[in-house]
Amino acid sequence: MAPLLRPADFPASARRHLDDAKLLEANSRLPNAGHLYGYAAECGLKALLIWHGHPTDAEGSPVHALGFRQHVDQLVITSTFKALKRFVNNRSGAKYLAMIPSISAFSDWKVGHRYFSETALPATLPRWKAAAYEVGRMLDQARMDGKK
């Protein structure tokens, strides 16, 4: 019997969401671009965790038990991000965390924004974009370092 493939591919998902966000922004679809910048960052953080040994479920997603199976706004809140930093730093991940200094920009990103009117969305797209680009560069570096 062939081994089961894990469908979750956080590095590829992060790149796909980042690329799609760029296309949406270029076509003045700013609310959806902002939403995808958040998903790109979330996937990048989860890739970082998994590369550094975080346990995964059968699909390849972070297990619930350690508190990291959340959306980006919850991953960057102080208590959760401190735990994330401790986990990754204890496994030689400080270099990658240093590459995403603006990740806290997603503290006002919400998965529920997809239901909001455009006028009710926060005006933080430029900050989300900058932070998502940092995550993209971090993923590029990790790939050059042999992370998959």
List the model feature ranges, each with a label.
Residues 1-148:
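Terminal alpha-helical segments
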